[in-house]
């Protein structure tokens, strides 16, 4: 079994594409194939001590899900299914997608909600990312000048994504026991 679980929620498919880009950097022994949380069950999720989780931000800065007018179930519906799980001993890194131009007041807010959920259940969260180089006005996901995970804007800064992904994976490598490809 792979060492790292890679799960995502998505509405338009962009978060899935980023998850696939992350997976493509590692072989199957290191990282599992990305799995949409709308297809995951509790056992899938709890099988890993290391998790990389991705989410877009929808609506008014919400996690994706039916109440945010997502096309299908997502994080909003999955989190209650794992709410009684103990995440002590698990290391989690988050990445989030948002549009800082159209939604400058809630850019990648969904990162905050995932961070809070897993932190409250004992997980070790790693992978904070500098908030410099972005053009948003406000975000719940920024604490002391850093995002609570990797923030990506595929609508306005897609050209920066490969560099940001590589930098972020280097940042979390030690916590995940990863050796990055050259």
Swiss-Prot record:
Pfam families: Flavodoxin_1. Keywords: Electron transport, Flavoprotein, FMN, Nitrogen fixation, Transport. It comes from the Bacteria. GO terms for biological process: nitrogen fixation. Its cofactor is FMN. The keyword Flavoprotein applies. SUPFAM superfamilies: Flavoproteins. InterPro entries: Flavdoxin-like (IPR001094), Flavodoxin (IPR050619), Flavodoxin/NO_synth (IPR008254), Flavodoxin_CS (IPR001226), Flavodoxin_lc (IPR010086), Flavoprotein-like_sf (IPR029039). GO terms for molecular function: electron transfer activity; FMN binding. Residues 4-173 form the Flavodoxin-like domain. Low-potential electron donor to a number of redox enzymes. NifF is the electron donor to nitrogenase. Belongs to the flavodoxin family. This is Flavodoxin. It comes from Rhodobacter capsulatus (strain ATCC BAA-309 / NBRC 16581 / SB1003).
């Amino acid at each position: 079994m792979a060492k790292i679980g890679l799960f995502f929620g998505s509405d338009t498919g962009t978060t899935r594409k980023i998850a696939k880009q992350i997976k493509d950097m590692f072989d199957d022994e290191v990282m599992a194939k990305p799995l949409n949380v709308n297809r995951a069950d509790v056992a899938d999720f709890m099988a890993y001590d290391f998790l990389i989780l991705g989410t877009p931000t929808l609506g008014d800065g919400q996690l994706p899900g039916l109440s945010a007018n997502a096309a299908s179930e997502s994080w909003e519906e999955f989190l209650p299914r794992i709410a009684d799980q103990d995440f002590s001993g698990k290391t989690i890194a988050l990445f989030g997608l948002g549009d800082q131009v159209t939604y400058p007041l809630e850019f990648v807010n969904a990162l905050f909600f995932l961070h809070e959920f897993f932190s409250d259940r004992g997980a070790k969260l790693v992978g904070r990312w500098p908030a410099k180089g972005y053009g948003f006005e406000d975000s719940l996901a920024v604490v002391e000048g850093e995002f609570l995970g990797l923030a990506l804007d595929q609508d306005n800064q897609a050209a920066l994504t490969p560099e940001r992904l590589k930098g972020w994976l280097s940042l979390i490598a030690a916590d995940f026991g990863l050796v990055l490809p050259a």
